[in-house]
Amino acid sequence: QGGWPRPGPEIPP
């Protein structure tokens, strides 16, 4: 999560 619109690992910023 974080800057990603779906749950999972925040690999993309």
Swiss-Prot record:
Q: Name one GO biological process term.
A: regulation of blood pressure
* Record keyword DNA damage present: no
Q: Which UniProt keywords apply?
A: Hypotensive agent, Metalloenzyme inhibitor, Metalloprotease inhibitor, Protease inhibitor, Pyrrolidone carboxylic acid, Secreted, Toxin
Q: Does the keyword Repeat apply?
A: no
Function text: This peptide both inhibits the activity of the angiotensin-converting enzyme (ACE) and enhances the action of bradykinin by inhibiting the peptidases that inactivate it. It acts as an indirect hypotensive agent.
Which compartment or compartments is the protein found in?
Secreted
Q: In which tissues is it expressed?
A: Expressed by the venom gland.
Q: Describe the family membership recorded for this protein in Swiss-Prot or TrEMBL.
A: Belongs to the bradykinin-potentiating peptide family.
> A Gene Ontology MF term for this entry?
peptidase inhibitor activity
Q: What is this protein called?
A: Bradykinin-potentiating peptide 13a
Gene Ontology cellular-component annotations:
extracellular region
Pyrrolidone carboxylic acid: which positions carry it? Q1
| Top-rank taxon, per record | Eukaryota
Which species expresses this protein natively?
Bothrops alternatus (Urutu)
